[in-house]
């Protein structure tokens, strides 16, 4: 009992710097060794920064590309509906571990005020508060959270997934911030091929830490779809700020940024692209991605 208490205190009190999405269908669930179920794993959580393409793509730097979910397990995407995942700093603080006994409304398993925010001085990050909690969220408050996204590729074999066939299909503003996050699915998203699709959870924080990015692997399946539409070939995104006329219209690739190679977007110093209108991504389901 004492050992369990010490472990939980250690996990909850650590100064985490990162967040990932936890749900069925994820790669590296329980760690990067499919033979071992580590319920306290955070290996999928670490960000991607200044890495060669061969390492950042699909989290190959930690072997997550080689740790798929069990056969037949998918993240279900209901066409025209919504799906919910858990954003957390460690699998321990989700319902995928310990029967959900360590979950709260927050990604770190802690308890925070509903209007949790950083101080109104300097950059004002959550981690600038006494105690330094909240650094994982890279934000001042919920409103300033940069937004997260999901992309889909209609390639059942992940070896065939590329930037030019991986299309962002939904975004969620003001995330990551709370544990539960619900994303909208375009109604015209077509069914996946036999063996399912590849999906990626995506995030580029806006300040409050290292200028990194996130790409997390999933096997996914579009459910309830009778659509015969096809997804367009995505274009690289462009940072457009407040001038929407400069934004890329239609299907867009994920943001590949601040890596040694493989980047598809460049910004001025201090400018952060994100899965939001400043980089051409509308809020919610991306209904303009079809041919």
Curated annotation (Swiss-Prot):
Subcellular location per the Swiss-Prot or TrEMBL entry: Secreted
Enzyme class: oxidoreductase
Gene responsible for this protein: AA14
Cofactor(s) the protein needs: Cu(2+)
Biotech applications: AA14 provides a potential way for industrial preparations of feruloylated oligosaccharides (FOs) or xylo-oligosaccharides (XOS) from biomass. Synergistic reactions with other polysaccharadide degrading enzymes such as the GH10 endoxylanase XYN1 or the debranching enzyme ABF62C from Penicillium parvum are important for industrial applications.
Record field: temperature dependence: Optimum temperature is 40.0 degrees Celsius.
Known role: Lytic polysaccharide monooxygenase (LPMO) that is active against heteroxylan, xyloglucan and cellulose in beta-cellulose and released native oligosaccharides and corresponding C1- and/or C4-oxidized products. May act mainly on heteroxylan with numerous arabinosyl substituents between cellulose fibers rather than on recalcitrant xylan tightly associated with cellulose. Catalysis by LPMOs requires the reduction of the active-site copper from Cu(II) to Cu(I) by a reducing agent and H(2)O(2) or O(2) as a cosubstrate.
Protein name: AA14 family lytic polysaccharide monooxygenase
Positions in coiled-coil regions: none
Signal peptide interval: 1-17
Glycosylation sites: 141
Gene3D superfamilies linked: 2.70.50.70
Family according to the record: Belongs to the polysaccharide monooxygenase AA14 family.
EC identifiers of the protein: 1.14.99.-
Activity response to pH changes: Optimum pH is 6.0.
Organism expressing this protein natively: Sordaria brevicollis
Disulphide-bridged cysteine pairs: 192-197, 199-220, 240-247
């Amino acid at each position: 009992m004492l050992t369990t208490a010490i472990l939980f205190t250690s996990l909850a009190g650590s100064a985490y710097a990162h967040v990932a999405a936890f749900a069925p269908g994820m790669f590296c669930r329980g760690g990067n060794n499919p033979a071992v179920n580590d319920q306290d794993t955070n290996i999928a959580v670490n960000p991607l920064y200044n890495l060669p393409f061969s390492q950042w793509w699909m989290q190959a730097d930690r072997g997550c590309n080689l740790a798929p979910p069990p056969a037949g397990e998918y993240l279900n995407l209901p066409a025209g509906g919504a799906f919910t995942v858990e954003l957390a700093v460690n699998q321990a603080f989700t319902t995928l571990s310990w029967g959900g006994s360590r979950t709260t409304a927050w990604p770190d398993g802690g308890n925070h005020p509903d209007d949790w925010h950083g101080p109104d001085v300097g950059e004002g990050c959550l981690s600038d508060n006494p105690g330094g909690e909240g650094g994982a969220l890279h934000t001042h408050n919920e409103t300033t959270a940069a937004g997260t996204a999901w992309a889909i590729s209609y390639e059942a074999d992940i070896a065939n997934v590329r930037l030019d066939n991986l299309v962002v299909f939904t975004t969620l503003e003001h995330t990551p911030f709370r544990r539960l996050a619900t994303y909208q699915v375009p109604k015209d998203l077509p069914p996946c091929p036999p063996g399912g699709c590849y999906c990626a959870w995506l995030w580029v924080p806006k300040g409050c830490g290292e200028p990194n990015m996130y790409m997390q692997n999933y096997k996914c399946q579009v459910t309830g779809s009778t659509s015969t539409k096809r997804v367009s070939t995505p274009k690289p995104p462009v940072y457009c700020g407040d001038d929407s006329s400069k934004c890329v219209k239609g299907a867009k690739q994920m943001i590949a940024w601040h890596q040694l190679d493989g980047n598809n977007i460049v910004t001025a110093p201090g400018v952060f692209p994100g899965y939001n209108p400043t980089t051409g991504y509308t809020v919610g389901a991306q209904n303009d991605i079809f041919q």
